[in-house]
Amino acid sequence: MKRPALLAFALATPVFAQPSALMKYACGPANRMFATLSAVSVYSDGHAGFDLNTLPGFTGQSCTSDKPFFFSVPVAEGSYRVTVVLGGDVPATTTIWSEARRLSVEKVHTEAGKSKSETFDVNVRVPEIAGDPAHHVRLKPREIGSLDWDGKLTLEFNGDHPSFRSISVESINPHEPTIY
């Protein structure tokens, strides 16, 4: 193939945006692969952390509680693949709800000291319409202040001693279709 033809082929080939970097959070000892979660890991604009005034306990290898707790990650509008490694030092049954009560993982049992990995997709929306700052989605009064439309990916951990060891969040290629 001659160089002009190769150049024409390269220019005609569509280039798609690559997914953003993987965001990883862990409840274990500090390491360079994950952001370590602790009692000071509270959600704020721009920083992932435990949200809605809930904070689990930390057992050295996992985040666990006898009550529901929330974890939020600030993200842009789009679809995300979430992988959660469940488990802890005590037996647990964990259910995960994403955003406003979307069931993502239902009653996964883990034995003490064991782990199970669960992967699911979450779609995050914001009221502003991309590319048109003058327009936005009109929210109903019941939607204002809910876990939808807020610019963050929120996970609720619930069940009998819900616990997790790590959470990974990765954006999905925007050219993949979202099916409801």
Where are these regions (language model features)?
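Bacterial N-terminal signal peptides that target proteins for export
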Residues: 1-6
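Hydrophobic h-region of N-terminal signal peptides that target proteins for export
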Residues: 9-17
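Intrinsically disordered, low-complexity segments enriched in polar/charged small residues
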Residues: 7-8, 52
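Compositionally biased, intrinsically disordered or flexible polar/acidic segments
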Residues: 18-180
